[in-house]
Amino acid sequence: PVRLLNTMEPTAPGTIINNEMQKGSIKAVAAKDNITVIKIVSNRMLLATGYLAKVFEIFSKYKTSIDMVTTSEVAISLSIDNTSRLVSILEELKEIGTVSVDYHMTIVCVVGDFASDSVGYTSRVMQALSCVPVRMIAYGASNHNISYLVHESDKQKALQALSSALFAHDKQK
């Protein structure tokens, strides 16, 4: 088990995360700072076969892990926390597409049971974040978390909004 503590309430007991999860429950919200987002737009109209592989090979070559990734027909957005080899990575990415970079981002992760038959939880999270510009969303790879990318300057607002929307009922007990 892992105990997550509340940075806004350091004396609070926090939340224990273990393998016993109540169906449809939301357990915790966590944040990871110092994230850099890279967007690659294909030079072709649609992503060619093997395009994603080429992108991932570049990151692998420079031993840089990817935290989040989203794709469309013509673009890939991904986030990293290690920028030590960013200049070299960008040079190679520019050979296969148009590249833009956003710095000072935060991944906000909502942990819970988001099984496909759970209804309403994702909309509660999105409604809570309606006051914050969301740059990217990763959902579906795991039934246990949804990750959102926001600017670091919006982190506090996002965490407070999620806490109020998702856990306010716990404080009333």
Question: Locations of the language-model features?
Answer:
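C-terminal catalytic "cap/lid" subdomain
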Residues: 1-141, 145-173
